[in-house]
Amino acid sequence: MSKMSIKVSFTVGVSLREALTEAREKAEKLGVAFIEFSFNGAFFAVSPQADIERGIEEFEKGMKAIVI
């Protein structure tokens, strides 16, 4: 597996589920370890194997740095 991560940003109006799903798809397609982005004050690092539901749950619990 690659040790590279790519930082991205999403446009206004994108839901967290959409952002996490697209980040996971891009990480898999590009063969990178993580796609990184911020969403409403929380940092996300999303791997190709990311559990989207876990990411949403951790965000709803108030976590500020979420690696999935």
Predicted regions, residues:
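Short intrinsically disordered terminal tails
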Residues: 1-3, 61-68
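N-terminal acidic leader/helix
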Residues: 2-30
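Intrinsically disordered, low-complexity serine/threonine-rich segments
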Residues: 5, 12, 40-42, 50, ...
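N-terminal non-cleavable signal-anchor helices
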Residues: 9, 47, 67-68
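Acidic, low-complexity, intrinsically disordered interaction modules
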Residues: 20-55
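Short, intrinsically disordered terminal segments enriched in charged and Pro/Gly residues
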Residues: 52-64
